[in-house]
């Protein structure tokens, strides 16, 4: 019997990740570079068979899964990034101005 394996892949670049802004529930699209990143990874994954592919329901993640060749990946709300609340969209330095111990 084969050992189970878990493969993890982060979504491609977004405008906010490019700028160092924290993103949780804001549903951002991939940048052109993010699309290219996913396409490059797809080449490495070509021919790999997975029993199950899961993705966050957010577009940046589900679009990445589709570009990787898994358009039918199951969307799981539990895989969405944590909620940054009032810090959504801010950079770490901007957050630390408001909350120095953050």
Each PLM stretch: what is its role?
Residues 1-3, 76:
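Solvent-exposed, charged interface segments at domain starts and junctions
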Residues 68-102:
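Phosphate-handling substructures
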Residues 3-4, 9-71, 98:
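Active-site-proximal alpha-helix that buttresses catalytic centers in soluble enzyme cores
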């Amino acid at each position: 019997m084969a050992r189970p394996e878990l493969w993890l892949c982060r979504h491609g670049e977004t405008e906010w990740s490019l700028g160092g802004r924290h993103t949780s529930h804001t549903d951002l699209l991939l940048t052109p570079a993010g699309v290219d990143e996913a396409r490059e990874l797809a080449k490495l994954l070509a021919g790999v068979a997975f029993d199950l592919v899961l993705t966050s329901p957010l577009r940046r993640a589900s679009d990445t899964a589709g570009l990787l060749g898994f358009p039918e990946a199951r969307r799981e709300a539990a895989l969405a990034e944590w909620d940054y609340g009032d810090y959504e969209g801010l950079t770490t330095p901007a957050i630390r101005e408001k909350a120095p111990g953050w």
